[in-house]
Design a protein with these regions (language model features):
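C-terminal binding/interaction regions
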Residues: 1-26, 75-125
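Short, well-ordered amphipathic alpha-helical segments that serve as non-catalytic structural scaffolds
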Residues: 19-22, 64-72
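Short beta-strand scaffold segments in enzyme catalytic cores
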Residues: 33-42
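Alpha-helix C-terminal capping segments
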Residues: 41, 71-77
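Compact, glycine-rich, soluble single-domain proteins
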Residues: 51-60, 64-66
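Short amphipathic alpha-helical face segments that pack within enzyme cores
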Residues: 63, 67, 96-99
Length: 125
């Protein structure tokens, strides 16, 4: 894991982080108020946002990363090049989200994962 700053990211990664930041504004979190935004960039450069959506039964809630990947799939894309998770804490995806990411990474174990916090911390995984 590498710690960096927004300014040191490539223009493509900066655009991905900005999309995740915007997506976070649409998060539906009436129970935890833990808003998270995400964005995926496909192998051909398209970007798809996602945000977390809570349901009173938290087990049926959907994480931002999964929503971004499902948005990508809904638009006919199948290969993730990079993913950003943006929220108040470290952006390391949970095990379930990692499984969804793996399903759409074309067996590439080096998919770029960027964790960005509301405090400005950026982690590259």
């Amino acid at each position: 894991m590498e710690i960096t700053t927004f300014d040191k990211l490539s223009k493509e990664d900066q655009a991905l982080v900005k999309t995740a930041m915007e997506a976070r504004e649409n998060a539906y979190t009436p129970y935890s108020n833990h808003k998270v935004g995400s964005a995926v960039r496909t192998a051909n450069g398209k970007i798809f946002p996602g945000c977390n959506v809570e349901i009173i039964s938290l087990q049926t809630s959907c994480h931002a990363e999964r929503n971004a990947v499902m948005n990508m799939a809904m638009h006919g894309e199948r290969v993730i090049e990079a993913l950003v998770c943006y929220g108040p804490y470290s952006g390391v995806p949970c095990a379930e989200c990692r499984q969804v990411i793996w399903e759409f990474c074309d067996n590439n174990p080096n998919v770029r994962i960027i964790g960005a916090t509301t405090e400005g911390e950026i982690e590259l995984m």
